Amino acid sequence: MAVQDVIEALKKETLEDVGINQNLAQLVKDIKMVGNVLTIVFEPPKQGLEDIIRAKVIDALGNLPEVQKIDVKFVKPQAQIPVKQQAPQQQQTPPPQTQQPMFTRKKVPGVKHIIAVGSGKGGVGKSTVAANLAVALSQLGYKVGLLDADVYGPSVPTLFGLKGERVTVDQFQRIIPVEKYGLKILSIGFMLPSEDTPIIWRGPMLMKALTEFLFSTKWGNLDFLVMDLPPGTGDVQITLAQNVELTGAVVVTTPQDVALADVKKAVSMFREVNIPVLGVIENMAYFICPSDKQKYYIFGKGKVAEFANAYGLKILGSIPIDPEVAEKSDKGEPIVISHPDSEVAKAFLSIAKVLSQVVESKVN
């Protein structure tokens, strides 16, 4: 295989999606082919782009028949040599200082929009909402992935009937997500010996795992990657805020005061770390009586609307209580799949439409 073939392939991969007007061929410092192992050394324009460049290289060259392994290496970006300037003849007013970011947020290659689904507390149905929202987006014709980032309580394997499923990797050590119901799915639960195995990780371990899930997974081209976050405002949320370019967050709550008190903290946290809050989903909003078809607001009515108005948020939709949701979830069948004509499924499809419109308006 000629070096020129590699260079030509790398010319087609650019860094324009991270605001840098260069292609990968311009960053190459060395190329070697020993047997069927291709080694390429890059000098990135700045630090923090290594995972993105590595993923783009594998996408560009991974299908070459002569190559069985690609080893991507990096040298540190060369520091700019300061230019000596003459002292000004008269004192000048310095230009206003702009605050430099303390971290670099990176895009996941091939993924247009990353939507984080969070909540202030557990028990509000966040994971069920994230799972059915992902399925609903897929049914609208979007290419969708679902990442179970709820590392302390991964429930996606149960919700999709994937208990005991194990992840595999390709020849380039990229994680291959599991596919079901038209989604590409990845969960920490796929990597545990059993569903009873606890995850006892500190912040650095969480950061490493999430980074691997996002940037070392073969997601392909996705319109949406839905992330099911753990409840609260802990290490996972901070890691994402510092390292990943999210389109925004969706918060899930129930109408109870105790849930609303905690979801306010979640909204404040997202805003504190400059993650846009795209809207609120009200779960368990009401119960439809089978006999008279009337709506009964078991946990009260109007509280979520008051909260949304106070915080300047959009209500994406309200989901009724339905015993079928829990029953089918335990069997690994999202309600949008098992009962597409139910009020709950219709609510999820409506929310997916509204969310996609919110995202498009934000982008435009």
Curated annotation (Swiss-Prot):
The segments labelled Disordered in the record are 83-102
Q: Where is the composition biased (Low complexity)?
A: 83-92
Judging by the UniProt lineage, the source's domain of life is Bacteria
Keywords annotated in UniProt: ATP-binding, Hydrolase, Iron, Iron-sulfur, Metal-binding, Nucleotide-binding
**A Pfam family recorded for this sequence:** ParA
CDD domains from the UniProt entry = Mrp_NBP35
- Please tell me where ATP binds in this chain: G120, K121, G122, G123, V124, G125, K126, S127
Membrane-spanning residues: none
**GO MF term list:** 4 iron, 4 sulfur cluster binding; ATP binding; ATP hydrolysis activity; ATP-dependent FeS chaperone activity; metal ion binding
- Summary of subunit composition and partner proteins: Homodimer.
The family assignment reads:
Belongs to the Mrp/NBP35 ATP-binding proteins family.
Function description: Binds and transfers iron-sulfur (Fe-S) clusters to target apoproteins. Can hydrolyze ATP.
- The molecule here is called Iron-sulfur cluster carrier protein
Q: What is the lineage of its organism?
A: Bacteria, Pseudomonadati, Aquificota, Aquificia, Aquificales
